[in-house]
Amino acid sequence: MLAVGCTLLVALLAAPAVALVLGSCRALEVANGTVTSLPGATVTLICPGKEAAGNATIHWVYSGSQSREWTTTGNTLVLRAVQVNDTGHYLCFLDDHLVGTVPLLVDVPPEEPKLSCFRKNPLVNAFCEWHPSSTPSPTTKAVMFAKKINTTNGKSDFQVPCQYSQQLKSFSCEVEILEGDKVYHIVSLCVANSVGSRSSHNVVFQSLKMVQPDPPANLVVSAIPGXPRWLKVSWQDPESWDPSYYLLQFELRYRPVWSKXFTVWPLQVAQHQCVIHDALRGVKHVVQVRGKEEFDIGQWSKWSPEVTGTPWLAEPRTTPAGIPGNPTQVSVEDYDNHEDQYGSSTEATSVLAPVQGSSPIPLPTFLVAGGSLAFGLLLCVFIILRLKKKWKSQAEKESKTTSPPPYPLGPLKPTFLLVPLLTPSGSHNSSGTDNTGSHSCLGVRDPQCPNDNSNRDYLFPR
């Protein structure tokens, strides 16, 4: 079915120009006897009465806003370089007797209309309008010819009357469209008056794809106290949009006043406020918002009018000498504390990451800084490992020099002692009866005991 509709639309657009003429656009008819003319032309008026023929003296009177009179010989009155304000009725008299009336209509032919169609809500009808560059004459009329392309019922032709609004300075026409209707329309605007007519180019639109909301309303940009780089932005749905059945998604864009490049954020559906976190300190910013149907039906609205705002500035601090301090200087701790305080924002004020790069640091600078930091960290780790290894080897060397060796450094040499096997005479008796009070010679290495009698039982068995 869709292929049939597309084929039909292509066939209509590819047809010759004659086949695309939706209706006959002709100049408006005027009453019998009315003389029409363009501005700047020369007009000849003829008194209609028979008695005015010949060389009779005819008195002419203009019945317009300004009273004017002429006297001519004969029944003709010649007006040179007529203007629009010469439009009116011209009365001709013969001997103070009214002979006849000649209507004159001076008009400007209409300019070629440029038709544009839109639909501000999926629940409303479509509107087509044209804004002429100059105010049209009171006799100018407009009508729109339309063809409705229906894949099931063929095509239907109809006309829509258009009204001129003095307040909006435009012609507008309303095309009835049912909710959910996806048919195609081909429309053309015909503008005509008594001296000419012009027709616009054909406009083709699809009922759903042409939906375009009005720009968001009541955009407000304000500073957040204590946040030198934050801006709070809030807005509302346009009055022409009914949020009962269809919601809007939004996009926000902002820039410093001296910049031409915008940073664009996509926002959540039905979100009507957000916080900009990367505004420049003390710099005025331009902010705009636009909207579109939540399921991408139709087109984006136009951007809202520009609204400016400046982030919060710290109050000047007075030094002891009475000189005010820098108002834009804020401590890092205060800024971090404020970020912690506002970091967990509500759903309505949650901020998404910007689509375009919003960091004021250029990419080459960021790469150089990151590479320098990584090189410094690697150098520190290398130095620490070298020092640790050096300290470990030095500690092991000191522990070897201070502690005694666990084993002898060389082979042990036996110690030879000359011990007599026999005790000299008299030695045994001279020891006395009390051995406890005398010196006991039981050790073989004692110099006072040259003889050792501990093994005498070996030599003298009992």
Curated annotation (Swiss-Prot):
PTM text: A short soluble form is also released from the membrane by proteolysis. The sIL6R is formed by limited proteolysis of membrane-bound receptors, a process referred to as ectodomain shedding. mIL6R is cleaved by the proteases ADAM10 and ADAM17.
Domain Ig-like C2-type: start-end pairs: 20-108
InterPro entries (UniProt xref): FN3_dom, FN3_sf, Hematopoietin_rcpt_L_F3_CS, Ig-like_dom, Ig-like_dom_sf, Ig-like_fold, Ig_sub, Ig_sub2
Notes on how activity is controlled: Classic and trans-signaling are both inhibited by tocilizumab, a humanized monoclonal antibody that blocks interleukin IL6R signaling.
One Gene Ontology cellular component annotation held by this UniProt entry: external side of plasma membrane
Pfam families: ig (PF00047), IL6Ra-bind (PF09240)
Signal peptide start and end residues: 1-19
Disulfide cross-links: C25-C190, C47-C92, C117-C128, C162-C173
Family annotation (PROSITE patterns): FN3, HEMATOPO_REC_L_F3, IG_LIKE
Sugar attachment sites: N32, N55, N85, N150, N218
Site features described as Cleavage, chain residue numbers: P354, V355
Motif WSXWS motif location, chain numbering: 300-304
Classification via Gene3D superfamilies: Immunoglobulins
Superkingdom of origin organism: Eukaryota
Disordered: annotated span: 423-462
PANTHER family, alphabetized: CYTOKINE RECEPTOR, CYTOKINE RECEPTOR COMMON SUBUNIT BETA
Family (UniProt): Belongs to the type I cytokine receptor family. Type 3 subfamily.
Protein name: Interleukin-6 receptor subunit alpha
Gene it is expressed from: Il6r
